[in-house]
Each structure stands twice: as C-alpha cells, then as structure tokens.
C-alpha cells in the first residue's frame, strides 16, 4: 500500500552537493562507480511518498510501517524493513537492512534515526560510497545534515578492492558541502592495511575549491644535493590572494625556503617569488644565496598598460647550481624591465626601464634609464600610400664600460606604397634614419666620439607572387602553391665605429631573416645594403585544407663589395657574404612530423647552422622525437648535438619516458633522463633517474673539465587526498636541460 504524508521537514534533508569530478574509470573500471540517484517521478517539494507492506496508525500523529518500506522525497530515498514516524515530534526511526540514497551518496546501514525538526539523519553501522567522486568507507555512525556528512569511527578511501591500496581511519571524518573539503581527527593512514602515518588533523579536497594545507611532497637523491625533500604548503589568504611556502631541504647544501605570492585585483595581476638559502654547506664562501622574481601586468584605464618583469640572483651560478621555477638553468642572462604604455587612436607610446643581468664572466650590459619610444599606429594615408613616423629617446648607463653614459635620439619617418591583389603584392618603402648620440666616459685614445650624428636613407622594394594548382603528387585531391619572393634593399655604407653598442645585437639569419630590412635588433648599427634577395616557398594542402608540406629557400645577392657584411667592419658575430637559407616541414601522416632548416655560406662552402627534428605522436601519450642541431659559432665555439625523447605507454597504468642528448663535438653524453610512471584512479607515483652536465658560467668547460650530476627523484600521490587531475608523463621530459617541445603543426 502507499500513503503520502505532508511532513514538510523531510523536504529539507539533503546531503552535500559536491562538484563533479572527472572519474578515471579507465583505470578502476566500474568497481567503485555508484549508480546516480534520481528522485521518484512526480514528487514535488514538501511531499513524502511512503510505500510498505503494512501500516499501523498510532494515534493521529504517528504511524508504523513494516515490510519493504520505501520512503521518497525530492532529496533522498530510503529503503528499510520497518519505519516509525512521529509527526508531532518530528522523528523518524527505521531498522534494517537500510539503504539510504541521495544525490551524492549511497549508505547501507543497520539503523536510522532522523530529527526532522533539525534536518539531520543518523545512520548506524554505515557503509557508504560517493556518487560524484571516487570514495567509499565505513562508519559506526554517519550523520547527514545541510552542511554535509559527519562520520564517527570511520574510514575513507578512493581505491577499489577489499584491501585498498590506501585508506584513512579516523575517530571523526567530516565531509563539508559548504567548504568543499574533508577533514579528519586522530587519523591513521594505512597502506595495504598497514599503518604508516598518524595524523592528528588532516584535510583533503572534495572539489576544486582552494584551501590552505600541505601539498604533495617530493623526494630525491643526487650527487649535488644529497637527500632532497620538498614539502610545499599552500596558504589560501583570500579569494584573490594566495601563497605557496616551500621548505626545500638538501642534505649537502642546507635548508632553502621558497615562497610564491600571487595576487589579482581589478587593475593588477602579479606574482612575487623569493628563494633564500642562508648558507650553502657545500661552499660557505658564497654566503647568502637567493633569487627574487616579480612579474605584474596592470590595466590602468582604457588606454594605459603597465608591466613589470624582474628577476635577480645572488650569484652567477645560482640557476645552474640550485635551479628555479622562474628561470632555466641554461639561461645566461636575466631580463629586468618595467614599462608603461599608452595606446591612443593614432600613437602608441612606451616608457621602459630595462636591464639584462649577464651571468658568467662576461661584460655587463647597458641599462636603459629610461627608453621612451613612440610609434604611429594609424599612419596618414592616401589611396595606397601611407606615411608614418616612429622614434625613441634613450639614456644608457654602464659603470664598467668605456662609455659609462650615453643618450640616443632616433627618429624614423617612413613613406610606403602597398598594393595587394589575390595573386600578387608589391611594397615599396623609403625611410630616413636619423640618430644622434651623446656619449660620456674616458673616451680619449679610443675610437668613440663624444657627439655623433648619423643620417642614413633606406629603400626597400618587395614583391610576392602566389600560384596555385590542383595536384595528385604525394597526396590525393591536393592543392600546391608556389610563392616566389623578391626583395631589393639599399642603405649606404657609413663608418659607425665611433658609436658604442648599447642594445644592439645581430639577428638570426634564417629564411625569414633574409627578407628583413635590417640585420640588427637595435639602431646602434645600421648595416649597409645594396642587395637582392630571391626566395620561394611551395606548400601542399590536403583535401581538408590542412598543410602537409612546405619548403622554403632563398639567398642574398650583393651588388657591391662595400655592402657585403665582411667588408663593413661592424662589431658583430661572424659575417657571411653569400648566405643561403632553407627550411621545410613534412606532415605526411597525422602521427608523423618532420621539420628541418639550414643556413649555408656558399662562398666559404660551409654550413653555418642546421637543425632537423623528426616527431611521432601516437595515442595515450605515446611519442618519439629525434633531433640534431649544429652551429659553427656559439660564443666562439662550434656545437653539434643530437637528442632523443620518448614516451611509451606500457599499459593503461604504466608509462615509460626517456631522453638522451649527446655532444658530438666533444664526443660525450650531456644529459640522460629516464623515468617510470604508474597511475590508477586512487594513487600514482613517478620515479626518474637523471644525469646531466654541470655548467660553471665563470669558466669555459672543456672535455676534461666537465663534471656531471646524477639524481633520482620520487613523487608519490594518493589520489582523492589531493589533486584529481591526471598526471602527464610528458612533463617529466621537460625537466632536463633540453626540454621536450611539442611540434608546432602536430595538432592531434
């Protein structure tokens, strides 16, 4: 029989509504997946549907139901053998076996007591499982109220099986719907039913909301650091403020404190990182060792932007010796800049203060204090003609240089004619480069002048054609393009040896560099030019219009000897008079990708630079990458290196990764990395072995001087007590000197 009782208080009984989390049933199958609960169709808020084999009325306010009792509301359902409801006192008692279900949990117990007036349900001898995340356990007493679940003498695990890999047993476990966190009191962590750790108080997440607490620690051992433990603590200061405080203990160096503070306001977002080691036990003469990093972006009204990016270290070998999250151990200089930008309708103005901290035994760079630059973003236009002006005012200082102070004023008016059609385009530019210098220092007996004025015209003519045809070569129903390019560039030759080098460096001579209108990044050197550049690109597109192949090649042809780089006497890197550059990409299969490039001196019959990379990317994090690179001049030395990256899934749970890099010039390995990762739905671990060359930036390391560091690192995570996101084994390949980089065109 069935009878509906108007007990309104039952309508407010509900369990915590936990945020949905992606369940990794790929690993655990459906052994822990509890069927999602749905309310009885037709029920409305405040209604109670009670069905039983028999019912006995005990006066006007109470009733006893017996035999296959089912009680349903819009928030929960209850199955029991008997149930006694006292409407006047607001009490519900049921005896078992009992099954209680709601949106987030399913509980089997021997008895149930409900205080309807206080919206609380207590179940005795409970075995529970969660429906919106992996989790199960037992409790002598389980209480459900509006805030969540409270379990007494209880257990919790996210692992399947009769003997879970890990479980928490505690005097009390609270699962809070309001805060999204669970907390335990007097808990013991068991691994394979063996107690391993006592936790007086412990918290863990139920959804993605942030809360202060310890994060997953990591452990490693290496020649350089000895035994290393990293134990981060997360501090959720406010919704827009947080910090991570990380003690890092190294048995051979000491205790380092790493802190990171993040903030977000309506106008600013930023990060401040500080790393500090009071004394390096391996080299006490170094004193305090530290790193400071500050990065901020500011939005100051509609047209104003500000940026800060500052990194500073205590000594040149800090990065190579201690590593950091804010810079790479391969960095040889640190960027420090602050800028204020105004973006108007016609002009963009930047006020910048910048400096490079050069690491190692090298000359210090100049500091720009400040540099004010302006660019016309909306040129004056007439038909296909436009006219624009750009320029800058900069003041440089460097106490260790011959020129210790300098002021540079540069202005560059430019007239352009730009005409474009579908099949071709033509561009002509005429510029006047006017630069004035005031240079101060002990200049007597040097080539530098105190005052310099330099005026140079520049003419650039550029045209490109676009041909297209259907093709069946190498690909069905494909399209091939041919894009020849031609450029003429003229700038007269002028002796610039009386000008210092303040912020100017030689640019890369790749295929795209052949068609630039300058060889340098700054204006302290303006290279003479009287040259044609001829090049072409061909591409293949499949029937889905995806690019599967391209090849580009080009060369500069000089019309006068004075325009050749070796004849200009510029203080720059090695110059080449007949530079040929080519590059290619082949993506013949969705899993395969090949890229290569070369720069060749046709006069000297030598390769300047070359690189080639072959990538394979399969399913489930399967990848292989082979690479080779060569350069005839890197800080005065030739380098030739080859490398291998691989990530192989052994099974659904196991992943193997490895990388190897070799210095062919000196015939030695420079980095070896191998690792193994296991991940299931309830726990994961990573173990890596790493051997790499150690660099001392204060000296040149030859083959006999090279030293190596070997290390083993272990990360262990109990899933369900921390982040629920899946691990990515490829991230292990990014930890070394030569980090893995995903191929640009590989989209699958």
Swiss-Prot record:
Function: Together with LptE, is involved in the assembly of lipopolysaccharide (LPS) at the surface of the outer membrane.
Subcellular location: Cell outer membrane
Record note on quaternary structure: Component of the lipopolysaccharide transport and assembly complex. Interacts with LptE and LptA.
Assigned keywords, A-Z: Cell outer membrane, Membrane, Signal
Membrane is among the record's keywords: yes
Name of the gene this protein is made from: lptD
GO-annotated biological processes: Gram-negative-bacterium-type cell outer membrane assembly; lipopolysaccharide transport
GO cellular component, one term: transporter complex
Family, as annotated: Belongs to the LptD family.
Organism: Pseudoalteromonas translucida (strain TAC 125)
Protein name: LPS-assembly protein LptD
Signal peptide: 1-19
């Amino acid at each position: 029989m069935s009878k509906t009782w108007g007990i309104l208080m039952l309508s407010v009984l509900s369990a915590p509504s936990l945020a949905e989390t992606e369940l990794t049933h790929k690993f655990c199958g459906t052994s822990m997946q509890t069927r999602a609960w749905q309310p009885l169709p037709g029920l409305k808020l405040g209604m109670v549907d009670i069905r039983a084999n028999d019912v006995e009325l005990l006066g006007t306010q109470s009733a006893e139901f017996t035999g296959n009792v089912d009680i349903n509301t819009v928030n929960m359902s209850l199955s029991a053998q008997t149930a006694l409801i006292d409407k006047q006192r607001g009490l519900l008692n049921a005896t078992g076996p009992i099954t209680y279900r709601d949106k987030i949990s399913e509980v089997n117990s021997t008895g149930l007591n409900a205080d309807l007036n206080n919206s609380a349900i207590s179940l005795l001898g409970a075995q529970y499982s969660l429906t919106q995340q992996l989790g199960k356990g037992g409790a002598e007493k389980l209480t459900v109220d509006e805030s969540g679940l409270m379990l007494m003498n209880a257990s919790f695990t996210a692992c399947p099986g009769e003997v879970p890999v890990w479980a928490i047993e505690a005097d009390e476990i609270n699962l809070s719907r309001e805060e999204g966190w669970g907390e335990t009191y007097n808990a013991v962590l068991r691994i394979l039913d063996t107690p391993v750790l006592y936790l007086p108080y412990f918290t863990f997440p139920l959804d993605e909301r942030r809360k202060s607490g310890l994060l997953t620690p990591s452990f490693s051992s290496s020649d350089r650091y000895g035994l290393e433990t990293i134990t981060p603590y997360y501090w959720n200061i406010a919704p827009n403020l947080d910090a991570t405080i990380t003690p890092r203990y190294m048995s051979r160096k000491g205790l380092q404190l790493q802190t990171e503070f993040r903030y977000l306001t309506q106008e600013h977002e930023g990060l401040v990182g500080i790393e500090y080691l009071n004394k390096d036990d391996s080299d006490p003469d170094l004193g305090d060792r530290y790193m400071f990093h500050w990065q901020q972006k500011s939005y100051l009204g509609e047209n104003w932007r500000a940026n800060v990016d500052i990194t500073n270290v205590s000594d040149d070998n800090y990065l190579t010796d201690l590593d950091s999250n804010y810079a790479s151990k391969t960095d040889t200089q640190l960027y420090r800049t602050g800028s204020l930008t105004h973006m108007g309708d016609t002009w963009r103005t930047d006020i910048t203060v910048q400096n490079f901290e050069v690491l190692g035994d090298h000359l210090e760079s100049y500091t720009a204090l400040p540099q004010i630059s302006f660019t016309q973003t909306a040129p004056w236009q007439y038909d296909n003609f436009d006219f624009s002006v750009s320029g800058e005012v900069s003041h440089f200082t460097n106490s260790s240089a011959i020129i210790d102070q300098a002021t540079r004023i540069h202005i560059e008016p430019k007239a352009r004619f730009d005409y474009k059609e579908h099949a071709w385009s033509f561009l002509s530019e005429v510029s006047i480069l006017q630069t004035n210098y005031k240079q101060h220092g002990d200049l007597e007996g040097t080539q530098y002048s105190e005052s310099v004025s330099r005026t140079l015209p520049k003419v650039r003519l550029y045209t490109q054609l676009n041909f297209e045809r259907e093709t069946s070569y190498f690909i069905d129903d494909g399209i091939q393009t041919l894009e020849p390019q031609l450029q003429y560039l003229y700038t007269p030759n002028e002796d610039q040896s009386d000008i210092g080098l303040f912020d100017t460096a030689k640019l890369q001579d790749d295929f795209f560099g052949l068609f630039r209108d300058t060889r340098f990044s700054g204006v302290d050197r303006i290279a003479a030019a009287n040259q044609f550049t001829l090049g072409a690109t061909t591409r293949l597109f499949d029937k889905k219009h995806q690019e599967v192949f391209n090849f580009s090649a080009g060369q500069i042809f000089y019309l006068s000897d004075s325009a050749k780089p070796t004849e200009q006497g510029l203080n720059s890197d090695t110059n080449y008079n007949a530079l040929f550059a080519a590059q290619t990409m082949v993506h013949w299969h969705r899993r395969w990708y090949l890229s290569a490039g070369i720069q060749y001196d046709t006069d000297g019959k030598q390769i300047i630079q070359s690189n080639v990379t072959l990538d394979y990317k399969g399913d489930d994090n399967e990848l292989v990458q082979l690479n080779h690179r060569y350069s005839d001049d890197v800080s005065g030395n030739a380098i030739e290196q080859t490398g291998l990256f691989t990530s192989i899934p052994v099974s659904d749970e196991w992943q193997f990764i490895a990388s190897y890099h070799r210095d062919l010039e000196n015939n030695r390995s420079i980095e070896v990395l191998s690792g193994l990762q296991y991940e299931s739905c309830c726990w994961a671990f990573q173990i890596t072995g790493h051997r790499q060359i150690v660099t001392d930036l204060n000296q040149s390391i030859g083959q006999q001087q090279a030293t190596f560091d070997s290390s083993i690192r272990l990360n262990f995570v109990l899933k369900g007590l921390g982040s629920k996101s899946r691990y990515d084994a490829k991230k292990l390949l990014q930890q070394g000197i030569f980090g893995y980089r995903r191929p640009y065109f590989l989209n699958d």
